[in-house]
Amino acid sequence: MKNVCKVIFLAIALGMGVSMCAQSNQESEKPVITSPPKSLNLDPFYKKYMNVNGIPVCSSWRVPDSCFHAAYITFKALTDMLPKKVLKSLVDNGARVTIMARYEGTTDVPEHAYLANDTTLNWDLRARGLGGTLRMPLSSCAEENILAYQIDKYHAENIAIHEFAHTIHNVGIAPIEPGFNDELRKALDAALAEGKYKNVYAGTNIQEYWAEGVQSWFNVNAEVDKDYGDGKHNMVNTRE
């Protein structure tokens, strides 16, 4: 985790610092939930909307307001931490978030409906969230994970943070910091050379190394009591 922490420290140097006071204030704040503004030109699927520091967060009518309240705390904290230029990059590149209701699947999201044509993988079983890219700057997450339902298959993790970390990386940082991916690659290569992240998701590529690292930084990653991993996780799940 030391190597990925170094990269996260780089992000912090860019302005991504943690403010516990701000987080405390966010918990007392309540988001304004409305219908999506017409200016977003969203699919009629979307009935609920809130704005978090310029980032639209939307869902169908099925997602309860309580989920928006919980999501607001997370996304407000994450976006408050970002340097202004990274947040501006996210907003300028059209970053958005969608929350899937408990009984909605990935392919119910209009922007991800095309994945139903993938004959190699059932995306409704595979994913309860996807990260954004410049081509598709939409990050998705799920009601049951945000509200920590017992039925959440990712109950030990915060997938909203993981997927939005992808969006911060791909849509916010990479377009304005050309050397950032090189730093990630060096950090991942060094970790793998030291025998770390074998047989874990974080070792897949720089994208997952970053997103899993951000999860661990915020202490919202899963832990498996195996140094050699189980294919997804090992004993590394905090910034320590």
List each model region and its residues.
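Pan-zinc metallopeptidase signature
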Residues: 214-240
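Post-HExxH zinc-binding segment in Zn-dependent metallohydrolases
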Residues: 171-223
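Boundary at the C-terminal end of the N-terminal hydrophobic targeting segment
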Residues: 22-24
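Acidic/His-rich structured neighborhood in mature extracellular/periplasmic domains
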Residues: 37-47, 52-60, 64-189
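Bacterial N-terminal signal peptides
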Residues: 7-17
